[in-house]
Amino acid sequence: MKIDITSVNGETAGSIDLDDAIFGLEPRVDLIARMIRYQLAKRRAGTHQSLGRADIHRTGKKMYKQKGTGSARHGSARAPQFRGGGKAFGPVARSHEHDLPKKIRALALKHALSAKAKDGGIIIWNDAKIPEAKTKGLKANFEKIGLTNALIIDGAELETNFSLAARNIPQIDVLPVQGINVYDIVRRDKLVLTTAAINALEARFK
């Protein structure tokens, strides 16, 4: 797949051939969905907790005698049916993380990249560098080239001026290539890759 290379300012800077084994697959939505579910499950804090019957600080003495009152039989006031009693089958603090094979995770990333390429949502930059760390100027530049909702992936190390200028722009995410992930690719309209990121991805999946 051949695609044009542009600069941060939108000027043409050549073209590049993208590897079809990474960017030319027929996207499988099921793999992408599994990977997103895996990512979001890992992010959950899992700190939800309610008081169960055993956690309630209340006397365990029988409420009233078994027979002779005309009322239903009851033992502990900690039971769920009483006001102030414990929650039956309530949430407990736990990890929501689940396993997903490494090969499936790698394949899901390829399919997410292929889906973005198929939709015409990939932009290739020669680099992500600017002379000074000015958010106002970078935001105006993005608006000029129509980049309002994007994930920008650079090489192994981000250029300091660019990352500082971009980090306060809404709906613009900047990550090094090792941080590329399916969820962030899908949640943004455009995926911007520098040539350094392309080379790193092709080396990673070789």
Curated annotation (Swiss-Prot):
GO terms for cellular component: ribonucleoprotein complex; ribosome. GO terms for biological process: translation. Residues 63-85 are annotated as: Disordered. It holds the Pfam family Ribosomal_L4. GO terms for molecular function: rRNA binding; structural constituent of ribosome. It comes from the Bacteria. InterPro entries: Ribosomal_uL4, Ribosomal_uL4-like, Ribosomal_uL4_dom_sf. The keyword Transmembrane does not apply. The keyword Magnesium does not apply. Keywords: Ribonucleoprotein, Ribosomal protein, RNA-binding, rRNA-binding. One of the primary rRNA binding proteins, this protein initially binds near the 5'-end of the 23S rRNA. It is important during the early stages of 50S assembly. It makes multiple contacts with different domains of the 23S rRNA in the assembled 50S subunit and ribosome. Belongs to the universal ribosomal protein uL4 family. Part of the 50S ribosomal subunit. This is Large ribosomal subunit protein uL4. The gene is rplD.
